Amino acid sequence: MANRLILVDGSSYLFRAYHALPALTNSKGLNTGAAKGVIGMIRKLVADYAGDQVVVIFDAKGPTFRNDIYPEYKANRPPMPDELREQIEPIHDTIRAMGLPLICIAGVEADDVIGTLSVQAAGGGREVVISTGDKDMAQLVNEHVTLINTMNNTTMDHGGVVDKFGVPPELI
């Protein structure tokens, strides 16, 4: 089924690659392990969904509107390690060089952008696949939206959400 909208949670990919893969550096001593992992996962997804539109979405640096509403939002989360932070711009550059749209909106989390794009596309009848490791995204699943977990190559539709969480997506 071509012309699906494939929404990639780049921020989820970034942290997954950083924590799952060994630390790698290039000849200049720059960290590259997360970059290698993220780009590898995206390349596989593009190959698996050839003919579909792939869009990669990342969190922007800095606070979001949620911090304005609730100042303690993610206050206990440790800061991003420098070894990971320095890989973000090269990852973004590589994704753009691959010809893929990259969305990163100041003040808005990637999850919110993915949710908005998903609802808009599905509302128009377009099939949407969200590639993420974030379980919160299960609330977006409906007749037009499925999740894919690239770690184990499984997809989750409405029935899969009910099986995994015991409730339908709209109750998550």
Located regions from the model:
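Domain-level signal for Mg2+-assisted phosphodiester chemistry and nucleotide/NA-binding surfaces
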Residues: M1-P101, N152
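Extended two-metal-dependent nuclease catalytic cores across DNA- and RNA-processing enzymes
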Residues: A2, L24-T25, A75-I172
